Amino acid sequence: MCISSYNYNPIIPSRRLALFHFASSVIAIPHSQSVLSGIKGSELFRVQEANAAEKNLFEWIKNDNRRFLHAVYRVGDLDKTIKFYTECLGMKLLRKRDIPEERYSNAFLGYGPEDSNFTVELTYNYGVDKYDIGNGFGHFGVVVEDAAKAVDLIKVKGGKVTKEPGPVKDGSTVTAFIQDPDGYEFELLERGLTSEPLCQVSLCVGDLDRAVVFYQKAIGMQILHRKDNPEQKNTVATMGYGPEDKNTVLELTYNYGVTNYDKGNGYGQIAIGTNDVYKSAEAIQLCGGKIIREPGPLPGINTKIAVCLDPDGWKLAFVDNADFLKELE
């Protein structure tokens, strides 16, 4: 019922007492005040309900079965890159496919089966033999038993070494840096045997605190460690879905004073497995991320995905876990 200011007659309380219900001692509340209280109460209920739903969503993210599936990037000569990765880095070619109607081919390589290991997905677009990597992509990390031996082999095979093997500053781990035929950089880390040799993806960000919060809340990662390096003028946060010695991690690097990066057109995205792409997309939007492909099945293969951009514009694709396993059958 609408209450009009023209026909509403408020009760004016006496000097001694407002209207008093003699039997129950209950103070009568003017009708307009009770309606307003009801409106405020319903609004409060809706806010509380929304907050509870948001809390439940972020709790779901913590328990979602997430892991890194693969990194996607473009190469100018697929066969040449496959040869380099298998002969110099010890990867295995897991599968390869050609899509002539869309004028591209791709290959998946890694150190173990795709259903349990992180891999790289190389994409070759017909007729394109060179890509701009930009300055925002950092490197991939690969665990090796002997960095010096690995570097010697890469030199023999004609690979480019950008940093000779040596211990990291303030540490004992021996590392080296090399480039693949397209200029993508790989850090070789001398460590013990691991179930996940393709251990790291490094990206540059313009605001580390903002990025860490986004990857924690929206993407469900844990911050494993954070280190400030004044001599190198950068701060690095390492994030992932489990211990660094058993899982691939994401390394976010903030270089002092640099807030924007050229991402080029070579590096594509990281794919992450999830039990529900729709809930994943909802969480990303709540945290300020941008959805660039709405959640739903891909034409032809029916694998459900959702694609978003993080606050720095790096692309992430969420892939339905069950659908991904069906792809591998």
Model segments located where?
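Core segments of cupin and vicinal oxygen chelate
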Residues: 62-66, 72-117, 156, 169, ...
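Eukaryotic phosphotyrosine signaling hubs
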Residues: 68-70, 135-140, 198-200, 265-270
